[in-house]
Amino acid sequence: MKLKKNIFTIGATVLLLSLLSACSSSNNSSNSTDTAGNETTAKTHLVTDALGHKVEIPNQPKRIIGSYLEDYLIALGEKPVAQWTVGSGSIQHYLQKELKDVPTISYDLPYEKVLSYEPDLLLISSSATVEGGKYEQYSKIAPTYVVKNGNDVTWETQLKDIGKALNKEKAAEKIITDYQKKVKATRQELADKINGKTAAVLWVTNNSAFMVSETRSSGRIIYGDLKFGVPNLVTEISKSATSDWSAVSAEKLAELDADYLILVNSDEKAAMFNEATWQNLKAVKENHVLEFGPESSWLYNGPIASQNMVNDIKNNLK
């Protein structure tokens, strides 16, 4: 009986150890599965874009197309696989140090061309780009994220949104903070040149003049950030503006009484520069014209463009 009892005890012990071992193996297997699942999940993150699409984006995308968002991508340390162009090869010249080897893609993002670049992420700068079923087409190629856009959306808002999409929100915040510090320092350094002075930004192309709106594009930099005064003509034109730049007739241009004129000159031989209307402008007569070419950043938006514009003002007025 004693022998049988010992055998029973040993058998029970072996059975218990076997059960514990099985449970342990099961737990390890479960843990391994969970870990593998977590690792898989960690490779992507889910975000909601400007149009309400829930988009699963790689944490570290390698082949991004962000047409007309290259400024933001470069600022965040990303190099796209293709860059924006329009018309007969117009590109963002001020970004070419970083994009010189990057091929171009038309602003309207032709499907076959997009497909040929094998992107792993598409960032869309305008809701209109994906109308008419195009979003569904693009999303078959790669995760497609429509960035916040519209006339009232600032570059800071767009940068934060792109930062969210790229899992680089802290980097986006730092860029904005650094820009604000630069603006503050520039205002202080140029206080005697800015305080009480007005300025206007004028783009001349094809012998025609266009004025930037008070709250858009470079207008935000000049008036909102650097705090130059707003000339009456700029205020008037801004009220009816439907885009960043509004056409200005020669008759209206004659009313411009800005202390400083920031000229974005895309037509150096424009006849208007020799006309009385131009020669009689206050800023022209006082030699307060700051001239920049079309390859500068003054026609664009974004963190790099904005920093460049602040630097341009600082370097020309200090």
Question: What is the predicted role of each segment?
Answer:
Residues 49-51, 102-112, 240-250:
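Short helix-initiation/N-cap motifs at beta->coil->alpha
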Residues 17-20:
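Bacterial Sec-type N-terminal signal peptides, specifically the leucine/valine-rich hydrophobic h-region
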Residues 256-318:
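Structured C-terminal subdomain patch of bacterial secreted/periplasmic proteins
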Residues 118-124, 143, 253, 258-259:
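Proline-aspartate-enriched helix->loop->beta-strand connector
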Residues 65-113, 121, 126-127:
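A short, structured surface patch at a secondary-structure boundary
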Residues 88-92, 211-244:
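Alpha-helical, coiled-coil/dimerization segments enriched in small aliphatic residues
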Residues 140-207, 296, 300-318:
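Extracytoplasmic substrate-binding proteins
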Residues 2-12, 22-68, 171-202, 265-269, ...:
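Bacterial Sec-exported substrate-binding components of ABC uptake systems
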